[in-house]
């Protein structure tokens, strides 16, 4: 993130991607935070907002801005070491999310301002932008929110990689994260996970060509 005041440096070229509290338990989220810190890596909030203990145990922590905005809090964004704008996911490219009602506990429901025990569905696109020009404005908005102190990262699902990466690069983020089909999800239909997306390695080649 050379465009920001406090770029993130990792000891290893791997970090723990966004997995929401709800999809994962409190114990899993905090354990992953501790493990990432021990490994010199980072973790990400995923959808649904911030767990204070995850932030406490993560030396380097991304806060995710996702389509639904469930749990998104500007004050929590200012506590992050980086902001990740979720645009797509490798195993369900172009689709929204689905959290089963049995995982929407009282605590999860409170964080997301939703009724407990009811299935939660996320839309496929963000409500406040429709294309590349709007995305560039969103990146700038997040820079202003964080006072340009932390990197802004765009997360893309690997599909039309060449075109998508060219579009994302024009929005002037600090980094572009390409998610391949290998990444698992419990928030999409099996038919999409089994039959869509491309491998991350193949996507990297197209991303390099785009840049």
Where would I find each of the regions flagged by the language model?
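Glycine-rich phosphate/ribose-binding loops and adjacent secondary-structure elements
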Residues: 126-211
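N-terminal capping/small domains of soluble enzymes
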Residues: 1-123, 134
């Amino acid at each position: 993130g050379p465009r920001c005041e406090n770029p993130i440096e990792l000891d290893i070229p791997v970090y723990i991607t966004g997995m929401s509290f709800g999809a994962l338990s409190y114990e899993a989220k905090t354990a992953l935070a501790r493990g990432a810190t021990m490994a010199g890596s980072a973790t990400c909030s995923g959808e649904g907002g911030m767990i204070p203990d995850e932030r406490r145990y993560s030396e380097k922590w991304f806060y995710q801005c996702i389509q639904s905005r469930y749990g998104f809090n500007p004050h929590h964004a200012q506590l992050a070491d980086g902001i990740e704008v979720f645009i797509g996911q490798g195993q369900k490219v172009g689709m929204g999310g689905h959290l089963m009602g049995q995982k929407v506990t009282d605590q999860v429901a409170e964080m997301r301002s939703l009724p407990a025990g009811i299935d939660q569905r996320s839309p496929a696109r963000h409500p406040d932008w429709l294309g590349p020009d709007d995305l560039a404005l969103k990146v700038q908005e997040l820079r202003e929110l964080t006072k340009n102190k932390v990197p802004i990262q765009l997360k893309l699902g690997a599909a039309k990689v060449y075109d998508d990466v060219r579009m994302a690069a024009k929005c002037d983020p600090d980094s572009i994260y390409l998610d391949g089909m290998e990444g698992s999800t419990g928030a999409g239909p099996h038919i999409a996970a089994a039959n869509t997306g491309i491998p991350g390695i193949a996507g990297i080649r197209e991303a390099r060509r785009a840049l």
